[in-house]
């Protein structure tokens, strides 16, 4: 489909499952190889997908063109979110108020395509709309997921202990990749996005409470 964010989520998930030692790792490597080959074949045969998935990505990353050509819309969203955060560092401007505050500032009104309903990045949205209070809560969750993932890898390598079973690793992958900071996202306060964020959390807590996969 040419949806780069979704493709990146899939790739990151596969790599997470590979680096989290489990009995299915070799099968995941095989599936990842098949996925990359399949996408490459489709991209070669479809110039529109090829241009969006590869050429446009390389251009915006500054590899084939000046980094200044990075998506002006996204760059504008990020800069505005940062400005709003600096003016309201502790509590932000309020949930779902990015649009209102952006349109109320004259300097932003003169810049096309920069005022939108949210800044298209979870952490920048939390900083601008909820300040440090909301940001640190979610960022702590992200760091916690990183910590227990590293703990699993360490115990598996050093003591040959399986800290998490494969189903739990999949749930961890879902939570961690959803909170990955360096990728465009939907609005954090959107209902369906919150299902993606928090439904796996409920499953993880249930598994932990029942001691089914630990």
What are these regions (language model features)?
Residues 15-19, 24, 28, 108, ...:
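Hydrophobic transmembrane alpha-helices and their immediate junctions
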Residues 1-9, 116-121, 183-196:
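Membrane-interface catalytic loops of GT-C/OST-like multi-pass glycosylation enzymes that act
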Residues 1-22, 45-47, 131-134:
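Helix-loop-helix junctions and helix-breaking kinks within/between transmembrane helices
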Residues 1, 5, 39-46, 138-142, ...:
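Alpha-helical transmembrane segments
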Residues 14-21, 38-39, 61, 199-205:
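Alpha-helical transmembrane segments and their membrane-interface exit regions
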Residues 1, 21-66, 77-87, 95:
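A membrane-periplasm/extracellular boundary helix in multi-pass inner-membrane enzymes
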Residues 63-79, 83-87, 91-130:
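Long extracytoplasmic/lumenal interhelical loops at the membrane interface
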Residues 14, 141, 168-214:
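Transmembrane alpha-helices of multi-pass inner-membrane enzymes
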């Amino acid at each position: 489909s040419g949806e780069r964010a979704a493709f990146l989520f899939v790739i990151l998930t596969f790599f997470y499952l590979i680096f989290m030692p489990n009995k299915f790792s070799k099968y995941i490597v095989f599936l990842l190889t098949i996925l990359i080959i399949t996408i490459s074949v489709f991209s070669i045969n479809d110039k529109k997908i090829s241009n969006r998935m590869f050429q446009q990505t390389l251009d915006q990353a500054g590899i084939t063109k000046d980094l200044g050509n990075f998506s002006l819309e996204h760059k504008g969203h990020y800069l505005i979110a940062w400005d709003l955060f600096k003016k309201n560092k502790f509590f932000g401007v309020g949930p779902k108020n990015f649009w209102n505050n952006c349109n109320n500032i004259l300097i932003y009104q003169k810049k096309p395509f920069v005022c939108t309903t949210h800044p298209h990045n979870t952490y920048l949205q939390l900083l601008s709309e909820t300040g440090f209070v909301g940001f640190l809560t979610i960022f702590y969750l992200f760091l916690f997921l990183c910590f227990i993932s590293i703990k699993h890898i360490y115990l598996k390598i050093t003591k040959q202990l399986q800290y998490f079973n494969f189903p739990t690793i999949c749930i961890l992958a879902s939570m961690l990749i959803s909170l990955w900071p360096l990728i465009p996202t939907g609005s954090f306060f959107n209902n369906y996005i919150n299902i993606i964020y928090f439904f796996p959390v409920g499953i993880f807590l249930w598994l932990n409470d029942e001691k089914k996969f630990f």
